[in-house]
Amino acid sequence: MNNDNTKVYVRVAGKRPENFVETKPFIWDSRRDKILWTKISKIDSLEDMDWQELGADLGAPEPFLKKRSYTLFQNQLKVLSNQIDVTSNTRSSSESRNSVDNNILQNLQASRIMNHKLDKTDNLANNQESSSELSNLSVSKSALEDALMDCLQL
Protein backbone atom coordinates (compact mmCIF):
# COMPACT_ATOMS: atom_id res chain seq x y z
CA MET A 1 0.00 0.00 0.00
CA ASN A 2 1.37 3.38 -1.01
CA ASN A 3 1.09 6.14 1.61
CA ASP A 4 1.10 8.87 -1.04
CA ASN A 5 -2.22 7.92 -2.58
CA THR A 6 -4.06 6.06 0.18
CA LYS A 7 -6.89 7.64 2.12
CA VAL A 8 -8.88 5.95 4.82
CA TYR A 9 -12.39 7.04 5.75
CA VAL A 10 -14.00 5.83 8.95
CA ARG A 11 -17.69 6.27 9.50
CA VAL A 12 -18.90 6.21 13.07
CA ALA A 13 -22.58 5.88 13.84
CA GLY A 14 -24.19 8.57 15.97
CA LYS A 15 -24.13 12.32 16.33
CA ARG A 16 -20.98 14.29 16.93
CA PRO A 17 -20.65 15.97 20.31
CA GLU A 18 -21.51 19.67 20.46
CA ASN A 19 -17.92 20.70 21.17
CA PHE A 20 -16.42 18.46 18.46
CA VAL A 21 -13.65 20.15 16.49
CA GLU A 22 -12.67 18.73 13.12
CA THR A 23 -8.89 18.47 12.89
CA LYS A 24 -7.19 19.87 9.84
CA PRO A 25 -5.55 17.33 7.56
CA PHE A 26 -1.78 17.31 7.86
CA ILE A 27 1.14 15.51 6.28
CA TRP A 28 3.60 13.61 8.45
CA ASP A 29 6.88 12.23 7.16
CA SER A 30 10.25 11.01 8.38
CA ARG A 31 11.74 14.50 8.15
CA ARG A 32 9.16 15.80 10.63
CA ASP A 33 9.75 12.73 12.78
CA LYS A 34 13.45 13.63 12.98
CA ILE A 35 12.67 17.25 13.83
CA LEU A 36 10.28 16.16 16.57
CA TRP A 37 12.81 13.70 18.00
CA THR A 38 15.62 16.29 18.06
CA LYS A 39 13.40 18.71 19.98
CA ILE A 40 11.86 16.29 22.49
CA SER A 41 15.04 14.35 23.17
CA LYS A 42 16.84 17.48 24.38
CA ILE A 43 14.26 18.82 26.84
CA ASP A 44 15.09 18.74 30.54
CA SER A 45 11.57 19.24 31.85
CA LEU A 46 8.01 19.46 30.61
CA GLU A 47 7.97 23.23 31.15
CA ASP A 48 10.62 23.57 28.44
CA MET A 49 8.30 22.10 25.79
CA ASP A 50 5.79 24.36 24.06
CA TRP A 51 3.48 21.87 22.32
CA GLN A 52 1.42 24.57 20.59
CA GLU A 53 4.48 26.21 19.08
CA LEU A 54 5.87 22.82 18.07
CA GLY A 55 2.52 21.95 16.50
CA ALA A 56 2.55 25.18 14.53
CA ASP A 57 6.13 24.55 13.36
CA LEU A 58 5.42 20.98 12.25
CA GLY A 59 1.87 21.56 11.04
CA ALA A 60 0.35 18.87 13.26
CA PRO A 61 -2.16 18.95 16.13
CA GLU A 62 -0.91 18.85 19.71
CA PRO A 63 -2.51 15.48 20.66
CA PHE A 64 -0.84 13.83 17.66
CA LEU A 65 2.55 15.26 18.64
CA LYS A 66 2.22 13.92 22.18
CA LYS A 67 1.26 10.45 20.96
CA ARG A 68 4.03 10.48 18.38
CA SER A 69 6.53 11.61 21.03
CA TYR A 70 5.51 8.69 23.21
CA THR A 71 5.98 6.31 20.26
CA LEU A 72 9.41 7.74 19.47
CA PHE A 73 10.53 7.38 23.09
CA GLN A 74 9.11 3.86 23.19
CA ASN A 75 11.12 2.93 20.08
CA GLN A 76 14.28 4.38 21.62
CA LEU A 77 13.62 2.41 24.83
CA LYS A 78 13.31 -0.79 22.79
CA VAL A 79 16.66 -0.07 21.14
CA LEU A 80 18.22 0.61 24.54
CA SER A 81 16.70 -2.56 25.97
CA ASN A 82 18.09 -4.60 23.08
CA GLN A 83 21.53 -3.07 23.60
CA ILE A 84 21.40 -3.93 27.30
CA ASP A 85 20.34 -7.50 26.47
CA VAL A 86 23.21 -7.87 23.99
CA THR A 87 25.65 -6.45 26.53
CA SER A 88 24.44 -8.75 29.30
CA ASN A 89 24.55 -11.78 26.97
CA THR A 90 28.10 -10.88 25.97
CA ARG A 91 29.11 -10.52 29.61
CA SER A 92 27.43 -13.77 30.64
CA SER A 93 29.25 -15.67 27.89
CA SER A 94 32.56 -14.14 28.96
CA GLU A 95 31.74 -15.03 32.59
CA SER A 96 31.13 -18.65 31.57
CA ARG A 97 34.53 -18.68 29.84
CA ASN A 98 36.05 -17.26 33.03
CA SER A 99 34.42 -19.99 35.10
CA VAL A 100 35.91 -22.62 32.79
CA ASP A 101 39.29 -20.94 33.10
CA ASN A 102 38.90 -20.89 36.89
CA ASN A 103 38.09 -24.61 36.90
CA ILE A 104 41.18 -25.33 34.83
CA LEU A 105 43.31 -23.27 37.21
CA GLN A 106 41.89 -25.08 40.21
CA ASN A 107 42.64 -28.42 38.58
CA LEU A 108 46.18 -27.27 37.89
CA GLN A 109 46.53 -26.20 41.51
CA ALA A 110 45.41 -29.59 42.67
CA SER A 111 48.03 -31.24 40.51
CA ARG A 112 51.71 -31.10 41.26
CA ILE A 113 52.40 -28.85 38.26
CA MET A 114 51.83 -25.68 40.26
CA ASN A 115 53.40 -25.27 43.66
CA HIS A 116 51.33 -22.29 44.85
CA LYS A 117 47.59 -21.73 45.29
CA LEU A 118 45.49 -19.14 43.47
CA ASP A 119 44.00 -16.47 45.74
CA LYS A 120 40.24 -17.13 45.57
CA THR A 121 39.29 -13.82 47.18
CA ASP A 122 40.46 -11.95 44.06
CA ASN A 123 38.18 -14.04 41.85
CA LEU A 124 35.21 -13.54 44.18
CA ALA A 125 35.70 -9.77 44.21
CA ASN A 126 35.88 -9.67 40.38
CA ASN A 127 32.71 -11.75 40.01
CA GLN A 128 30.82 -9.59 42.52
CA GLU A 129 31.86 -6.40 40.70
CA SER A 130 30.69 -7.68 37.33
CA SER A 131 27.33 -8.87 38.71
CA SER A 132 26.73 -5.50 40.40
CA GLU A 133 27.42 -3.75 37.08
CA LEU A 134 24.78 -5.90 35.40
CA SER A 135 22.23 -5.22 38.12
CA ASN A 136 22.78 -1.47 37.68
CA LEU A 137 21.96 -1.81 33.96
CA SER A 138 18.76 -3.77 34.42
CA VAL A 139 15.90 -1.28 34.45
CA SER A 140 12.47 -2.57 33.60
CA LYS A 141 10.86 -1.35 30.42
CA SER A 142 7.64 -0.51 32.25
CA ALA A 143 9.52 1.68 34.74
CA LEU A 144 11.09 3.64 31.89
CA GLU A 145 7.72 3.98 30.15
CA ASP A 146 6.09 5.18 33.38
CA ALA A 147 8.81 7.79 33.82
CA LEU A 148 8.32 8.92 30.23
CA MET A 149 4.56 9.19 30.67
CA ASP A 150 5.05 11.23 33.85
CA CYS A 151 7.50 13.52 32.05
CA LEU A 152 5.15 14.09 29.12
CA GLN A 153 2.05 14.16 31.36
CA LEU A 154 0.11 11.90 29.00
UniProtKB/Swiss-Prot annotation:
Keyword Protease: no
Localization per record: Preautophagosomal structure
GO biological process: autophagosome assembly; protein transport
Pfam families named in the record: ATG29_N (PF18388)
Top-level taxonomic group: Eukaryota
InterPro entries, per the entry: ATG29, Atg29_N, ATG29_sf
Keywords: Autophagy, Protein transport, Transport
UniProt GO cellular component terms: phagophore assembly site
Family label: Belongs to the ATG29 family.
Function of the protein: Plays a role in autophagy. Functions at the preautophagosomal structure (PAS) in order to form normal autophagosomes under starvation conditions. Also plays a role in mitophagy and regulation of filamentous growth.
Name the record gives this protein: Autophagy-related protein 29
Provenance organism: Kluyveromyces lactis (strain ATCC 8585 / CBS 2359 / DSM 70799 / NBRC 1267 / NRRL Y-1140 / WM37)
Phylogenetic classification of the source organism: Eukaryota, Fungi, Dikarya, Ascomycota, Saccharomycotina
Gene designation per UniProt: ATG29
